């Protein structure tokens, strides 16, 4: 993003299906004025950003914005996966009076931040040691399931983002199969996102309750 001055502001946002986080980013990558809002309390992304701009007294500033969004962003028209929000990149820029507006996939943003982490910001899981300058897989459950890959090319990192959470859930044992069979009574197609996410935990719980009740009834 462009560097900040007294009249220029870099606005950044992390937009998920449950929460939206807005902040001001400076040229040294430091951020301030971080605010979190619940998406369900607003009718549109425009409404949330307008509120933040008013609260932070930014109306008279020249604003460059970069929004990380939990859905595909390559068409210029955004239809969020886990939220009933739709908008045009061009129209949003005009409505907010922005100097510039960039949209990136939320897991592209997360993946590109991985090389910036220091050892104190990392937690080791499992055995073995990390190999430097090798591809990095990024995966995280939230409202949905986000995935991305980070590939080193010519001393730079390139991100390959996708919608991996939408691939079919593959059952591997008897309990998995029982859970899958229950979830298929709710939806014709069951993706990994439906078991590995915030609402996925709820669905697994519901499935286990159903399975246990059915077994008790048969005993």
Where are the predicted features?
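Short glycine-rich, Thr/Ser-proximal phosphate-binding strand/loop in the N-terminal lobe
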Residues: 2-51, 161-166
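Short coil/turn connectors at secondary-structure junctions
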Residues: 7-8, 98-99, 132-136
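Short beta-strand scaffold segments in enzyme catalytic cores
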Residues: 20-24, 71, 138-139, 145-151
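Residue-level signal for inorganic ion chemistry
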Residues: 22, 92, 201
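A glycine- and small-aliphatic-rich helix-loop capping segment at beta-alpha/alpha-beta transitions
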Residues: 27-29, 83-86, 117-125, 152-160
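N-terminal phosphate-binding loop and adjacent alpha-helix
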Residues: 28-63, 71-83
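Short beta-strand-loop/turn "lid" adjacent to the catalytic site in phosphate-handling enzymes
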Residues: 58-108, 112-121, 138
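Glycine/GP-enriched mid-protein hinge/lid loop-to-helix segment characteristic of carbohydrate kinases
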Residues: 127-137, 145-219
């Amino acid at each position: 993003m462009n560097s900040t001055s007294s009249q220029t502001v870099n606005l950044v946002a992390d937009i998920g299906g449950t929460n939206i986080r807005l902040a001001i980013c400076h040229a040294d990558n430091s951020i301030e004025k971080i605010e979190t809002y619940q998406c369900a309390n607003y009718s549109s992304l425009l409404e949330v950003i307008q509120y933040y701009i008013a609260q932070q007294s930014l109306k008279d500033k020249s604003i460059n914005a970069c929004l990380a969004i939990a859905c595909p962003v390559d068409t210029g028209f955004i239809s969020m996966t886990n939220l009933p929000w739709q908008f045009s990149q061009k129209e949003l820029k005009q409505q907010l009076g922005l100097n510039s507006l960039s949209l990136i996939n939320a897991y592209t943003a997360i993946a590109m931040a991985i090389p910036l982490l220091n050892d104190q910001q990392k937690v080791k899981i499992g055995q073995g040691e990390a190999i430097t300058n090798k591809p990095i897989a990024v995966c995280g459950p939230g409202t949905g399931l986000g995935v991305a890959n980070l590939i080193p090319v010519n001393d730079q990192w390139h991100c390959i983002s996708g919608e991996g959470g939408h691939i079919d859930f593959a059952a591997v044992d008897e309990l998995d199969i029982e859970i899958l069979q229950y979830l298929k009574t709710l939806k014709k197609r069951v993706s990994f996102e439906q078991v590995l996410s915030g609402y996925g935990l709820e669905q697994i719980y519901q499935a286990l309750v159903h399975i246990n009740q059915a077994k008790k009834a048969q005993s």
